[in-house]
A protein has these predicted regions:
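Structured interaction patches on ligand/partner-binding surfaces of diverse proteins
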Residues: 18-45, 110-134, 138, 199-223
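Short beta-strand/loop motifs in extracellular/secreted proteins, especially
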Residues: 68-72, 101-103, 157-161, 190-192, ...
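Short, solvent-exposed loop/turn segments in extracellular or other extracytoplasmic domains
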Residues: 87-92, 176-181
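Conserved small/polar residues in nucleotide/adenosyl-binding loops
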Residues: 259-262
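Short Pro-Gly-centered beta-turn/loop motif in secreted/extracellular proteins
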Residues: 2-12, 94-104, 183-193
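A short, amphipathic beta-strand motif
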Residues: 54-60, 72, 143-149, 161, ...
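Beta-strand-rich extracellular modules
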Residues: 16-18, 59, 108-110, 148, ...
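A short beta-turn/strand-edge loop motif at beta-sheet boundaries
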Residues: 63-68, 152-155, 241-246
């Protein structure tokens, strides 16, 4: 830019608009012009930096693998810029050539089985620089319930449990499989009460519930041991020959000892 026919005095130049992709610098640049020097030429130089960029990276907190499909909001604290982005297959999203300033980045939604991070991050973007913002998320926890015979350790199939979140609204019921196992994955973080509700006819119901706390990224195991109802076999034989005798009738009744104190 050339300014002609200037008069003596202090001149200031202020940038009002920068080329596309560059930051405008509103800092005045001053020069004193002395016309007594004749046709002397004065040169003023202004430097512009490229607009900054922001790269957001989203990974699994335990494995470090990228998490695609995460939606994040970006809002300027020092200006009016606002937008949202979704991480790609590599778990990242890049905003190029956005205004310099201070931004707040918030996680809005995540794919299953991850838990949304409630932590905002603040980042300052400086002209000509690319700043990284890294979010790490944990998977929702899992719960394993095992049911075993207290005498033999063998699994017990067909036992139904009620699983209730103590500090939340989650509730479900499930029944042990042939391995005596129930597995619930991707359930909310929190404290749970597990109550035995129904057992096969030969198993004695356990009336004492168990409680467990599930934290993000972990699987907890709760084991119930139950006694199996006893069985009674009666054999009737000939006292001389030892041969079995059929059609004998017996009266079976439950009895107990009664203790009294003096």
């Amino acid at each position: 830019i050339e300014v002609k026919d200037v008069t003596k005095g202090l001149w200031s130049f202020v940038e009002t608009e920068a080329p596309a992709g560059y930051c405008a610098d509103s800092t005045p640049i001053s020069v004193y012009v002395d016309t007594t020097d004749g046709n002397k030429q004065y040169t003023v130089t202004a430097t512009n930096y490229e607009l900054p960029s922001m790269k957001i990276i989203k990974t699994d907190a335990q494995t470090g693998t990228p998490i695609p499909g995460t939606v994040l909001s970006i809002k300027s604290v020092t200006g009016s810029y606002s937008t949202s982005v979704t991480t790609g297959a590599d778990g990242s999203a890049t905003l190029s050539a956005i205004p310099a300033g201070v931004y707040v980045v918030r996680e809005e939604s995540v794919p299953e089985p991850y838990i949304v991070s409630n932590t905002e991050q603040t980042v300052a973007l400086r002209p000509g620089k690319t700043s990284e913002v890294i979010f790490v998320d944990y998977e929702k926890p899992g719960l394993e319930i095992l049911k075993k015979n207290i005498a033999t350790g063998e699994p017990i199939e067909g036992v139904t449990y009620l699983i209730e979140q103590i500090d939340g609204s989650y509730s479900t019921s499930a029944t042990t499989d042939s391995a005596g196992r129930i597995f619930l994955d991707s359930i909310p973080v929190g404290s749970y009460r597990i109550t035995e509700k129904n057992v096969p006819s030969h198993v004695i119901l356990s009336e004492i519930p168990q409680e467990v706390y599930l934290e993000a990224g972990c699987t907890r195991t709760v084991t119930f041991f139950n006694a199996v109802k006893p069985s009674l076999t009666i054999l009737k034989r000939n006292s001389v020959t030892g041969d079995p005798l059929s059609n004998a009738k017996f009266h079976i009744y439950y009895g107990c000892l009664l203790y009294t104190s003096d």
